[in-house]
Amino acid sequence: MATTHTLLSFDDLEFLLHRKDLTDLYGERCGTLNLVINPYELFLPDELDDDCCDDPFNCCFPDVYASIGTEYSYIDPPELIHEEHCATNGTWPNGDPCEPILPPFTITGTHHYYATKPGEVVSGILSKLGSSWDPSLRSTADVSNSFTFRAESDGPGSAEIVTEEQGTVVQQQPAPAPTALATLATASTGKSVEQEWMTFFSYHTSINWSTVESQGKILYSQALNPSINPYLDHIAKLYSTWSGGIDVRFTVSGSGVFGGKLAALLVPPGVEPIESVSMLQYPHVLFDARQTEPVIFTIPDIRKTLFHSMDETDTTKLVINPYENGVENKTTCSITVETRPSADFTFALLKPPGSLIKHGSIPSDLIPRNSAHWMGNRWWSTISGFSVQPRVFQSNRHFDFDSTTTGWSTPYYVPIEIKIQGKVGSNNKWFHVIDTDKALVPGIPDGWPDTTIPDETKATNGNFSYGESYRAGSTTIKPNENSTHFKGTYICGTLSTVEIPENDEQQIKTEAEKKSQTMYVVTADFKDTIVKPQHKISPQKLVVYFDGPEKDLTMSATLSPLGYTLVDEQPVGSVSSRVVRIATLPEAFTQGGNYPIFYVNKIKVGYFDRATTNCYNSQILMTSQRLAEGNYNLPPDSLAVYRITDSSSQWFDIGINHDGFSYVGLSDLPNDLSFPLTSTFMGVQLARVKLASKVKAHTITAK
């Protein structure tokens, strides 16, 4: 009998040894895949042309075979294949890795193993097996038809609700003639809004209605504009003009308001709404606070041209004001405002989204989302609270919606760069600033502090002592016992340099070799030996105290404000007579039931270890930066509203007016707000409407 011997090559022998090592790790299951299944049919989709594919596991469509698994060569260590294969199968609840259901397999004639993902190959094999039993058996779901999803409950109601609840459409009389609202199709060169944006209402804002509101007071006033709908506002960045009306839906969620009625009025373009019952002379409808379903009004587009530009505000207005308050006790409800485009709404004149047009944008990014990024515009520490005041004021680093400021600093904290001149025989402790390298206003350094000293003092060597009754071991700061000669000044770290002449007869080099030292800076009137308070800044009123030179030289200094010399228990910037300004001091007062606020942060004080005092800021620094550099559109009688929420779900609205000051609808704020806070832009509302809030009852009056 003849015996046939098969000679194995070195690669074949090495491959067999490699498979034996895998068998030790996986068990006897590891081996060659002997199922007679065409890999084309197993993995390649039917819609792909596979007639010319001779290597499906090195396919031109790598995304098709990504689900098969990782390909390993037999030269890869078996331990590596096993470890990485286990890593793709997840873990048990106790953290142990799951053993793969299907071990690596090789296709006959190749020297590669395929470590499959869980279930991929098994699923394909079972699908083919099922098809051999019943050719009509489908292994995939047919999702070509639309599905209708329905939420079921035990409560009564119809099971056939498949669309959003729309509300009650209010018939407005007299209705404008349809021909007056028609848009010429030839005037639109852009594509109309897709149907999906036309079918549902999107949240716009919410307003409060209290039964103590006077009859005729304006609760809501909105001019027709794409910005009142979030989707229209987004799409508007692609177009230059628009036309058409907008539907507005109101939902009243009451808290015991019975018998009250609201009036919805349509005010034509060119007419400014006033707070009076005479507004009912305009076309209007009334709706009751007891209305359980939403009510829908349409703001028609009444225009004398074919289209509106994006910055046009002289359009039809929808105004809501109280017509009747039916109860004597004070009670409040919330009115949710939602919008959607009307059927005739369209955009026109396509433009690139990055191109700028002259009108401003929506003020939706003035306050950072997280309070960890809130820094004051008077001092550079993080905001830690709020102070509600009947009057708020600040000039330096305060900007309005016209991108203007009455101050002298940019909305960034940069080192203060100044020049000081020393002379023989003069006071070598107190100096005037003679020049500056960086200035928004000529002669006044960028970043120079904006408060002055509280009282007249002597220009002495700077006694930094406290009264004799001060006890060094005491843990209580007694600022009234501060007897230093330079209280109210700002403590700065300094880098100083001097120019050394070739013929150094006055030994200026000795002065240059002195170490940089602390400087105390302030705005004051310094003459002879007297330093007086000065609330109007000028290049001649910039005073510096430090152990200065006794030579005739000019010194350049770069200062960084680090702290403050304590004056009394009042926060820095809380007394208007001590706040420095160039000419006028911008101010904000209570209006429409809303109160102006300061943003409060901490500033370190000298002498006391780790001690701080409060500092008042008129704006968050990011707000100052946005207003200085951006172009925002906000009417003078409106507020850009942000909802501030703490970690305990308390919230209140902050409104920023056209002058850049911030308001809240409360006369005081709780002292237990849980930081960090979050900010959400809520839209634009009238400044005369009280801002909403939901905070705990136990509050303290801010000081």
Curated annotation (Swiss-Prot):
Assigned keywords, A-Z: Capsid protein, Host cytoplasm, T=3 icosahedral capsid protein, Virion
Pfam families: Calici_coat
Gene3D superfamilies: 2.60.120.20
GO cellular component, one term: T=3 icosahedral viral capsid
UniProt-annotated site: Cleavage, residues: E152, S153
Organism domain of life: Viruses
Annotated InterPro entries: Calicivirus_coat, Rhv-like, Viral_coat
Subunit note: Homodimer. Homomultimer. Interacts with the minor capsid protein VP2. May bind to VP3 and Vpg proteins.
Function: Capsid protein self assembles to form an icosahedral capsid with a T=3 symmetry, about 38 nm in diameter, and consisting of 180 capsid proteins. A smaller form of capsid with a diameter of 23 nm might be capsid proteins assembled as icosahedron with T=1 symmetry. The capsid encapsulates the genomic RNA and is decorated with VP2 proteins.
Similarity remark: Belongs to the caliciviridae capsid protein family.
Protein known as: Capsid protein VP1
Biological classification of the source: Viruses, Riboviria, Orthornavirae, Pisuviricota, Pisoniviricetes
